[in-house]
Amino acid sequence: MTVLVSLSGISKNFSGVQALKGVDFDLRAGEVHALVGENGAGKSTLMRVLAGEMKPTSGTVSIHGETMQHSGPRGAAGRGISVIHQELALAPDLTVAENIFLGRLPRIVNHRRLRKAASEILERLGFDIDPAIHAGRLTVAHQQVVEIAKALSNRARIIVFDEPTAVLANTDAERLLAIIRELRAGGTGAVYISHRLNEVFDLSDRITVMKDGSHVETLETSATDVDAVIARMVGRQMSALFPSKAGRVPGEVVVRVRNVSRGRKVRDVSFSVRAGEVVGLGGLVGSGRTEVARLVFGADKMDSGTVELNGKPLHLSSPREAVRARIGLVPEDRKQQGVILDAPIRINTTLAKIRSISRLGFLDAGKERQVAVALGAEMRLKASSVDAPVSSLSGGNQQKVALAKWFHADCDLLILDEPTRGVDVGAKGEIYNLINDLAKAGKAILVISSEHQELFGICDRVLVMAEGAIVGELTESKFTEQQLLTLAMTRSARERDETSQ
């Protein structure tokens, strides 16, 4: 197989700090090579060297067997290298077509030809996106597609995907992964950076693990497993990330959901969660788990059924009422719904219970800071100060801020929807400890996760959903991925058969 890229002995120093230490890496034509490691491992820095965004302190970059001199991003693009960053770089006020060909537009633009060329590339990717609309009006998923179209228009044969699914819903993420598979089949070489190890194993041919700026090992994906990769990333296996459940004693029922329905999304769902208990909601994408969470939180209105909190019926018409009832929700899309990115940490952490830091209707800034500092210490938050905007934090620390908000609110029931999505492995372990501490303190916790090991590692029970209904319950003695998938997939297949008859 042809080697497209060879990085040899790449080192990079920043003011005496060695970010990369003699790293070797290569990429072949028609493969997806995953690059994994904790935040700060050096993954993005290495790819910025490849993309010409940084000049290495030492080492060589070879493209198609030819050693290249550093010539900046434009030079790298000219050699067929493109990077799809997590933070997208489209010009929102330009059209889709203009974005795709940006930097290569003639002085006099024939917009009809431009739109036609853009449409042809988008159709190759399987998306019907109007090339004439402004990029700022697109969903995040469609913006990702336009970024890929831009790379293809530049005849890129080497594409780096840096956390491409971090802000995407599951269905959009699946479509993006399908595009990457098609690119691979056409001979493109792709570097895939992600904390989502399930995606890494589903997509990649090889996996390179980095730690503290060094190359640890490159593995054939088919010859390794998640535990082996995690052990190389953090020095311990996945199972070691989960805290002991000893000391968690389930008490009285905190929340009881009875026969709740909403259209075909949620159908006759009933369950309960006790104080000091962590209950999981598992199932396939689209099974109705998030919809159940939104109904319990008052974000959506149920067609029928009841929710009781501490033995009393709840009649929630909004999330505001849920917060007053001491119910909290950390949503799956933390950047859009869980935190205010541009606001400082101190505002985000106290937002759900702002009355507790107010006096006579006025905010007590000193108390706000005091609470935020205390929460930051409890959460082991890594930030320069509580005045720093949440947008400046890593994914794991952003998630800690989202959790801190509900720690401060002192909820009786906390719903966590994909609590470690887009979070590195080390931060996952810290979040699992926080969840465990809440349970030990007597809080009722409902966890939704697409990572089965996560559900089994932190939950006392797992309810399995399919086609909007709860189809089974797994206790610890039956915690296996096979059991969960058998319940989820058998019911899903049966429902589809019944619908088609």
UniProtKB/Swiss-Prot annotation:
Entry keywords, A to Z: ATP-binding, Cell inner membrane, Cell membrane, Membrane, Nucleotide-binding, Repeat, Sugar transport, Translocase, Transport
Transcription recorded as keyword: no
Cross-referenced Pfam families: ABC_tran
Catalytic activity, reaction form: D-ribose(out) + ATP + H2O = D-ribose(in) + ADP + phosphate + H(+); D-galactose(out) + ATP + H2O = D-galactose(in) + ADP + phosphate + H(+)
GO cellular component: plasma membrane
Protein name: Putative ribose/galactose/methyl galactoside import ATP-binding protein 1
The protein's enzyme class: translocase
Subcellular location: Cell inner membrane
GO MF, one annotated term: ATP binding
Disulphide bond pairs: none
Species annotation: Rhizobium meliloti (strain 1021) (Ensifer meliloti)
Enzyme Commission number: 7.5.2.11, 7.5.2.7
Superkingdom: Bacteria
Family: Belongs to the ABC transporter superfamily. Carbohydrate importer 2 (CUT2) (TC 3.A.1.2) family.
Function of the protein: Part of an ABC transporter complex involved in carbohydrate import. Could be involved in ribose, galactose and/or methyl galactoside import. Responsible for energy coupling to the transport system.
Ranges where the ABC transporter domain occurs: 5-237, 249-492
Keyword Translocase among UniProt keywords: yes
Family matches, as SUPFAM superfamilies: P-loop containing nucleoside triphosphate hydrolases (SSF52540)
Matching InterPro entries: AAA+_ATPase, ABC_carbohydrate_import_ATPase, ABC_transporter-like_ATP-bd, ABC_transporter-like_CS, P-loop_NTPase
Topological category with respect to the lipid bilayer: Peripheral membrane protein
